[in-house]
Each structure stands twice: as structure tokens, then as C-alpha cells.
Amino acid sequence: MTLATALLCVMAVQDPPKVNPRYEFWAECKAGSWVKVKMLIKTGQMDIETVAVTTLLEVTPEKAVVETTTTTKFGDKEMKLPAKKEEISQKPDPAQPMKPAGESEEEITVAGKQLKCRVYEFEMEQNGQKSKGKSWTTKTIPGGVAKSEFTSEKMPAPMKLEAVEWEKK
């Protein structure tokens, strides 16, 4: 599962949303707001660590435009990808493979800060592979993602994603 897919899973668990949840979290911010997330995948043979910094470039009533820079470490090797711009529509994506499995509230510590989060549990099946996850979201962090964990039949350990730094303007 890629970082983009993971973030999409985090934001697409409502049933069915009237406004794209990813847009809603960015629309609460001003241009220049950013979040740095770290994702860790254990493959059994090596750990893969991805760090992504997403910055809000523009927000309008119709869309939010963000740019993400990503660096991935495969063991001792590091690969930096070119910055990628993305337009996040205010309209929800009708192709939602998620099945909500639970929703609650929880206070967690992320980047040394206590945050009250909305917790979503979900299940999905894509390309014949079943997976499930749990995501903690908050309007305190640009983009909304505080922390997520995903498991699937083919992963030897859960994939973990967590916000490590951010600035909300």
C-alpha cells in the first residue's frame, strides 16, 4: 500500500460523505500550512520508512491544492521523489472501497502533544486482498491525519503512519 493510498483510506471512511473529508481537513487551514508524516512498513526482510511533507498551496470553495515531497528509505538506500501536486475536490469520491467497522473518540499523544481524535475503524477489499485499519483524525493537524495502522493478509506486520511535525496557519 502506497502512502497516497494509505492517506486516502484514512480520509474515506465516512458513509457516504456529503463533502470530501480530505478537502474538509485542508479547508480549515490557510495556504502555507503543512504536515510531515512518517510511515513504517516492515516487510520481514527490511524496514521501509517513508517521510512525506504535504503543504497546502491553495484552498478555494471548490478544491484544495497540496504539494507533497516524499523520501523513502529501503534499508541503507534512500530515494527522494520529485514534489507532486494534487487537487483535492470538495466533492466526495464515489469510488469508495471502505466499509466502516466502527467509530469513536480517543485522546492520544502524537509528536509529544495530547490530541483529541475521532477514531475510524474500517475494512476493505481491493484486488482480492482484504485489509483493515484504524485511523485517528483531528482538525488540529493540517490534512487531519494524526495516526493510522493498517493490516492485510499479505503484510507480515502492520503498516504504521503518524504525524511527526506540523504547522497550521
Each predicted region: which residue ranges?
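Acidic, serine/threonine-rich low-complexity disordered tracts
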Residues: 15-169
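Sec-dependent N-terminal signal peptides
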Residues: 1-13
